[in-house]
A protein has these predicted regions:
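Extracytoplasmic
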Residues: 12-38, 43-47, 64, 154, ...
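Extracytoplasmic gate region of multi-pass secondary transporters
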Residues: 28-36, 246-304
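Interfacial helix-cap and linker-helix signal at transmembrane-aqueous boundaries
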Residues: 39-40, 71-72, 155-165, 278-279, ...
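Conserved MFS/SLC helix-loop-helix module at the cytosolic interface between two early adjacent transmembrane helices
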Residues: 63-101, 310
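Paired small-residue
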Residues: 91, 102-110, 339-347
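Intracellular juxtamembrane helix-capping segments at the cytosolic ends
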Residues: 117-131, 354-367
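Helix-loop-helix hairpin linking two adjacent transmembrane segments in secondary transporters
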Residues: 145-195
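C-terminal transmembrane helical hairpin of 12-TM major facilitator-type secondary transporters
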Residues: 293-299, 305, 310-362
Length: 437
């Protein structure tokens, strides 16, 4: 007798992760650049001075990353993410009440600390726990919402700021972010399916037809679980050894992951300067803000396919192709024609999924099970530290040269380095067979 398959709670987790990434990474982080020019013009700050808060944001985020996987594993995920959402939204709204640089710097530190528990780490970890199948696809779907919400947010703020001012814009942004995330964290999110007495999506139990097959299947399952437990134990011991004795630092994959994350994350910082690039090219603020929307459209559109392509062709090939496409977008941003800049912004949007979608899947090639969270946190932490100065440097390049040409070239060079590192990683994977694709 066949039973109708029940709806799996993993899809609720996916919906929660979509809102989590959309309301944090999308609505706040991806829209930060819309405020740069209005704030600098109103308060007389230099671009490099204001954008230094983004460097402090990145440093604070990196400092918190080692604790994310540890806390999610040991504490109630609802409390961790809920408290982080209140801190994240509150620090964003506080910027609307600020008039001195130090206030942005203080808010940036708080915002960065909270972002580690919201923006990039929790969703891949939770989805990896809940989905045994289609992991790449669902990570990509969740990441799509950061682009979707960023696209809506940047477009909306492009009209809100001229109408009611940048101060009200910050307050609205912060309240919306916290208001969307907190209910999701409290009522929907759970760390792993075992917490609810469930199996992960795709982890199906065998259903033999007779007692003999039941016994035989039980033996096979026991043997399989023993082997998997042994592999998992070895992986966890390896990961523990890396934390205590520096074994992680001896793995080439760690350095490759750090370089890919750091360079792609730094290249993604250029997104914050796209509205200013549009103003430099003679576009009105509402039109220039659309450049961020176009970049986030490219970001969102590419995420629909990147995760699925990874499931089909492997993350190495997809990561290499995506980095070349992102590099082409950088080249188009160097031209002054508005239509070319808009096209370049859209293609440039592929830069952001390099770190938010593809790097988490890249890390799953090398670290499995409970070892994945700590390893991914370490890779993200060191990569974020590498990327952190580029927010300030990108703004300072404009202060020094009066043009965003140098900023775009440096960002493009970083993406080229991502491509070269991925090629090296591909050779490493071919030489050393790994569990998984």
């Amino acid at each position: 007798m066949e039973t109708k398959q029940k709806f799996h709670y993993a899809w609720i987790i996916l919906a929660g992760c979509c809102i989590l990434q959309g309301a944090s990474l999308g609505l706040v982080n991806n829209c930060a650049g819309v405020f740069f020019s209005p704030v600098c013009e109103d308060l007389g700050f230099e671009m490099g001075q204001l954008t230094f808060y983004r460097t402090l944001y990145a440093l604070s985020s990196a400092a918190a990353m080692p604790f994310v996987a540890w806390l999610l594993l040991r504490a109630d995920v609802r409390a961790v993410i809920g408290i982080a959402a209140l801190l994240f939204g509150g620090s964003t709204a506080f910027m609307g009440l600020s008039s001195e640089l130090w206030q942005w710097y203080a808010a940036g530190i708080l915002q960065g600390f909270a972002s580690s528990f919201l923006c990039t780490l929790p969703a891949p970890i939770l989805l990896g726990n809940w989905f045994q199948e289609k992991t790449g696809t669902v990570v990509g779907i969740a990441a799509v919402f950061s682009g979707f919400m960023g696209m809506l947010g940047s477009t909306g703020l492009g009209f809100v700021i001229p109408a009611v001012g940048w101060r009200a814009g910050y307050v609205i942004q912060g309240l919306l972010s916290a208001g969307l995330i907190v209910p999701v964290a409290v009522f929907l999110l759970r760390y792993r399916p075992e917490d609810m007495g469930l199996l992960a999506y795709g982890a199906k139990e065998a259903k033999p037809k007779n007692a003999e097959s039941w016994a035989e299947t039980g033996k096979k399952e026991k043997t399989k679980k023993t082997e998997e437990s042994g592999r998992k134990s070895e992986t966890i011991q390896s990961m523990n050894g890396s934390q205590k004795g520096g074994r992680l630092l001896s793995q080439p994959a760690f350095y490759m992951g750090v370089l890919i994350y750091g360079c792609s994350c730094a290249g993604a910082y250029l997104n914050s300067f796209l509205p200013s690039r549009g103003i430099e090219a003679g576009m009105a603020l509402s039109a220039a803000a659309m450049l961020t929307s176009l970049a986030l459209f490219g970001n969102m559109f590419s995420k629909f396919f990147l995760g699925r392509l990874c499931d089909s062709f492997g993350v190495i090939l997809v990561l290499a192709g995506a980095s070349l496409a992102a590099l082409a977008g950088h080249v188009l941003l160097l031209f002054d024609a508005p239509a070319v800049i808009m096209t370049g912004a859209c293609i440039y949007g592929i830069t952001m999924p390099l770190s938010t979608v593809l790097l988490p899947l890249f890390c799953r090639l090398f670290w499995k099970g409970d070892a994945y969270g700590p390893a991914f946190s370490c890779v993200s932490m060191v990569g974020t530290l590498i990327a952190s100065p580029f927010n300030t440097w990108f703004g300072s390049f404009y202060d020094w040269t009066g043009s965003y040409g140098l900023t775009i070239c440096v960002s493009g060079g970083l993406i080229l380095f991502v491509f070269l590192t991925v090629c090296a990683a591909g050779r490493l994977v071919r030489r050393s067979p790994l569990p998984g694709k």
